[in-house]
Amino acid sequence: MVVGDIATGTELLVIGAGPGGYVAAIRAAQNGIDTTLVEKDAYGGTCLNYGCIPSKALITGANLAHEAGNAEEMGIHADPVVDMSQLRDWKSGVVDQLTGGVEKLCKANGVNLVEGTARFKDENAVRIAHGGEGQGSETIEFEHCIIATGSRVIQIPGFDFGDEPVWSSRDALEADTVPERLVVVGGGYIGMELSTTFAKLGADVTVVEMLDDILPGYESDVARVVRKRAEELGIDMHLGEGASGWREEDDGIMVTTETEDGEENEYRADKVLVAVGRSPVTDTMDIENAGLEADDRGFLSVDDRRRTDVEHIYAVGDVVEDTPMLAHVASKEGIVAAEHVAGEPVAFDSQAVPAAVFTDPEIGTVGMTEADAEEAGFTPVVGQMPFRASGRALTTNHADGFVRVVADEESGFVLGAQIVGPEASELIAELAFAIEMGATLEDVASTIHTHPTLAEAVMEAAENALGQAIHTLNR
């Protein structure tokens, strides 16, 4: 048993071992900095353990089952049975492999790993509480610190995640049975990904969204493609309704909603999944002791080096204001912060940040929309290629959606792109690279793309913007 407070020191302290924290720690150690990484739960953070990775594993299983059971047109007749316990075990195996890999990578790069919960004592020291009662604590003094504590799911009034019928996204990913009836509160990207997944696994799914469309933040024609497919999967969509509560009934639960006009509606379910967003975790570390102050939503303000108002303390990932809550953003911010600590002349550039939604079909976006470009003072030119004109898309039997490229008419520089369709999450990387390297429409259009591939649609969209498309009518 460890008693008392042990004092140690480190050049760089990183709090949180998610995709922002562990990447920052490894990069700092690679630059010769004495680095200590503190984690209270599991290496890899929410993304690897309770979010991105397990959800994509579950989506893969649901897609395989659905494809196998809906391929009569190809002459394939099957009635697959999904063993949810076995699917969950496979998913957990993937997660365990990756979390173990993160820990090994940190150790191999010379990062000092500490398990516990960090609270600031002042602007140059934290107290680490190790586990439960009697396991002791230590004080770690630091020259620099990176806060990478991530975010937690938002809980709304009337829906306590401690109640058995109420699921958070984490609960949904741990399910060992498929509910017969599932109400999903929230039509954002998490809600729509899980709605689609459970519908494919056999649940009768109802989505309740308080706004007038699903997928806020994405263009309406992109959301329309996903909404149409969701309805084809049997998902019942109710827009303009906010969830107000639930009650137990003899045969399950009843979820109550209310419209802006005060009209109440009720939906019967076995489980209700609340997926209305996430909030930053900055309220558990006594940040005020370090001279830091979060805004009224809990976010920290940083500069383009990811420095907070206390210059030797950095923040990356979901705790940072005005940046998207995306794992790859956190990782890039972590690299920027670590390299700045090492004295490198770096800065975070957000103009080419891709985002993906793993619905059916998938969504991939990067950079500016046409409206964004106009607002920024550009005269945009837009090219679009429907997947129904793609031979490869047709051979996959998934040809809904399109690739759209936005460019500056005068210079030809690619400014942004929106993709909704098969493998959009993969295809968007080409256009993120185009923006990052300053490519023009001509660069993209003149690059020979393999045939037959989905990526040809990117080339054709650029050709369409130039008025040179072959396989679709020029705009």
From Swiss-Prot:
Belongs to the class-I pyridine nucleotide-disulfide oxidoreductase family. Its EC number is 1.8.1.4. It is found in: Cytoplasm. GO terms for cellular component: cytoplasm. Keywords: Cytoplasm, Disulfide bond, FAD, Flavoprotein, NAD, Oxidoreductase, Redox-active center. The active site is at residue 451. PROSITE patterns: PYRIDINE_REDOX_1 (PS00076). The keyword Nucleotidyltransferase does not apply. It is an enzyme of class 1 (oxidoreductase). The gene is lpdA. The active site is a redox-active disulfide bond. Pfam families: Pyr_redox_2 (PF07992), Pyr_redox_dim (PF02852). Its main location: cytoplasm. Disulfide bonds join 47-52. It catalyses: N(6)-[(R)-dihydrolipoyl]-L-lysyl-[protein] + NAD(+) = N(6)-[(R)-lipoyl]-L-lysyl-[protein] + NADH + H(+). GO terms for molecular function: dihydrolipoyl dehydrogenase (NADH) activity; flavin adenine dinucleotide binding. One of its GO terms (biological process) is 2-oxoglutarate metabolic process. Its cofactor is FAD. Binds 1 FAD per subunit. NAD(+) binds at residues 186-190, 209, 275-278. The keyword Cytoplasm applies. Homodimer. This is Dihydrolipoyl dehydrogenase. FAD binds at residues 39-47, 56, 118, 318, 327.
